[in-house]
């Protein structure tokens, strides 16, 4: 078995973010380029509206993100967005060092996607770049980008950073969030929401508008706002206030015997199994002469036995369905 190392983990994550961002944006850019091909009507830019094209492009971005997050979640986290990575750094889910590796990978992946679409699909013009709509001031565009990014990032934090029984379908919620953001933002700002998405076409066509900075500052501020709200809710223990989505899962809970077996497996410490179903005393130790590990384990036992979510089996006759097989 190959030994894990931080360098190897960083390399795998970097490759995952580069390839994942490339695939996400390639299919999204290609859909936008296809929808905006001249056919007697104007391309869907912030200067003209066409709801059918708007829906097509918004759905393409949302579906492409959902599919690729699902694929790459276990490889790199499926971030594909510097704003998302920033938020994960703020909540301490990703280290700053790792972020400095992932963000350049995202920018490179996005740029390769933009170059691939430009090279593969006929036509000289890039029709998927972002720009402000008519009458939209820079500060207005900034706040639009801030709010759209806030929605996406907060969705990701609540569905992915919070581990629940619905985490496995989180990519659907993330895709819907981006879909909604594009429905709102395409006409007004081009719906950047992602610095890699805004930067890539501008780089390939070597054209950066004077207000390009809003596609970096807006998402960054949105990330700070989303991370701040998330941390605030966690500090206030929001899960104890409203209905608990995971109540059923917790009620199923663990029996004392299951909890005991888990602790024994993790700690590797033998003990005398008592018929009461409680976790008993440690072999070869006394209350006054337990090792630090024993004392720590004893604290865990007391917590588990006092936890109302852990069902205790019948005295001396544990239910066989409660025991691991």
Curated annotation (Swiss-Prot):
Region (Disordered): 279-298, 305-325
Extent of motif NPA 1: 81-83
Entry GO MF terms: water channel activity
Disruption phenotype: Completely inhibits the development of conidia and infection structures, and significantly affects noxR expression. Leads to the loss of its ability to cause disease on tomato leaves, whereas it can still cause lesions on both tomato and strawberry fruits, but the diameter of the lesion is significantly reduced.
Induction line: Expression is higher in vegetative hyphae than in conidia and infection structures.
Coiled coil: none
Domain of life: Eukaryota
Cellular localisation: Cell membrane
Stretches assigned to the Extracellular side: 32-52, 122-140, 189-212
Positions glycosylated per UniProt: 39, 47
Catalysis performed (reactions): H2O2(out) = H2O2(in); H2O(in) = H2O(out)
Residue stretches of biased makeup (Basic and acidic residues): 286-298
One GO term describing the cellular component: plasma membrane
Residues spanned by motif NPA 2: 194-196
Transmembrane spans: 11-31, 53-73, 101-121, 141-161, 168-188, 213-233
InterPro entries, A to Z: Aquaporin-like (IPR023271), Aquaporin_transptr (IPR034294), MIP (IPR000425), MIP_CS (IPR022357)
Keyword list, A-Z: Cell membrane, Glycoprotein, Membrane, Repeat, Transmembrane, Transmembrane helix, Transport
Predominant cellular place of this UniProt entry's protein: membrane
Stretches of the chain found on the membrane's Cytoplasmic side: 1-10, 74-100, 162-167, 234-325
This protein's domain notes: Aquaporins contain two tandem repeats each containing three membrane-spanning domains and a pore-forming loop with the signature motif Asn-Pro-Ala (NPA).
Role: Plasma membrane water channel that regulates the reactive oxygen species (ROS)-signaling pathway through its capacity to act as a membrane channel for hydrogen peroxide uptake. Required for the formation of infection structures and infection, especially on host leaves where it is essential for the penetration into the host. Regulates the expression of proteins related to redox-regulation and intracellular signal transduction and plays a role in the distribution of mitochondria in the hyphae.
Family per record: Belongs to the MIP/aquaporin (TC 1.A.8) family.
Protein name as catalogued: Aquaporin-8
Source organism of this protein record: Botryotinia fuckeliana (strain B05.10)
Annotated gene: AQP8
